[in-house]
From Swiss-Prot:
One of its GO terms (cellular component) is membrane. It is found in: Membrane. This is Uncharacterized membrane protein ECU10_0880. It holds the Pfam family RabGAP-TBC.
């Protein structure tokens, strides 16, 4: 995707689709608790872990946005959303904390306490002063906040939701094609083992990346390509992911041409699998039909004797 950057791709997600809803929703406590726990665990890539106040504000904002968008929450969404929160708000928050617009954390806290703070934050039952501070922050940046909400809704609705609805139907179908593609490369992946890649695919590989430049490169490809794209990237990243290694230095790699080439292979493999499945279904129907005819003949003979 030569000449196309993350920012360019993102612009197409900043606009509301005519037929979609973007109204805020109210979730039940259990779903909010899942979101809260996910946000606590989410690492904000590229943010200094010692900067307690910046992390706290960004995570509060992350929770609030995930809590209100009209998309059923799936675990892992907080990690994807964090990329967009950082894109739109990291510089703003860091600048306001540095200028004292957002009150900084206590100087008496140790670095260890500050680093661990992200794992003990309360979002559902946050202190009133924190809620007031966040509301003022959102009010100051309401236009950017509105864009963030639209982007999150569009990204999840177009790119993640299709994979997880109907009990992960499309995810399972695409994973089956991925397994067939790897088999052609001489790598056999048992069905149960294939599910260990779910954490990579459903976070757009954020868990396997260590640099934001690489994250943006992967995201721009996923956002601009069909929803088979994560499975094609999994083909390319398989060796590193299966060996627990970090995917790095891919900014200057020709990922997009490789994905396009693999898309053709994916389509051909899918046709072959469906053709084979169709033959199996016909065989079952044929055997079932013959069995029915035989049973009917037997019943007819028994009835005739009686």
């Amino acid at each position: 995707m030569e000449g196309i950057k993350f920012a360019d791709v993102l612009r197409s997600f900043e606009k509301k689709a005519e037929d979609d809803e973007y109204v805020s929703v109210e979730r039940d406590y259990n779903e909010r608790k899942v979101i809260e726990n996910d946000v606590r665990r989410t690492e904000l890539l590229g943010v200094d872990k010692r900067n307690r106040k910046v992390i706290k504000v960004l995570k509060r904002l992350l929770f609030v946005e995930l809590d209100k968008i009209p998309i059923k929450y799936t675990q892992g969404m907080s990690e994807i959303a964090s990329v967009f929160v950082l894109y739109y708000f990291q510089n703003i928050v860091e600048e306001e904390v540095a200028k004292g617009v957002l009150a900084s954390g206590s100087d008496e806290e140790s670095a260890e306490e500050s680093a661990a703070d992200g794992f003990s934050e309360q979002f559902i039952e946050a202190p009133e002063d924190e809620n007031v501070e966040l509301k003022r922050f959102v009010s100051r940046h309401k236009d950017t906040t509105a864009i963030l909400g639209i982007v999150l809704t569009n990204v999840f609705r177009r790119k993640l939701e299709p994979l997880v609805v109907d009990d992960f139907k499309l995810y399972k179908e695409n994973m089956r094609i991925f397994v067939e593609m790897m088999k052609k490369k001489g790598i056999r992946i048992p069905e149960l083992e294939s599910y260990k890649f779910m954490g990579s695919i459903l976070t757009f590989f954020l868990r396997n990346l260590s640099r934001m430049e690489d994250v943006h490169k992967v995201f721009e490809i996923i956002l601009s390509c069909p929803n088979t794209c994560p499975f094609l990237l999994l083909v390319l990243f398989y060796d590193k992911i299966s060996n627990g290694k970090t995917i790095d230095s891919i900014v200057n790699n020709d990922l997009f041409p490789k994905v396009v080439k693999l898309e053709e292979e994916f389509v051909e493999t899918k046709k072959r699998v469906e053709s084979r499945s169709g033959f199996s279904r016909m065989r079952v129907m044929l055997v079932g039909g013959i069995a029915s005819i035989v049973a009917a003949v037997v019943v007819y003979k028994i009835t005739k004797k009686e």
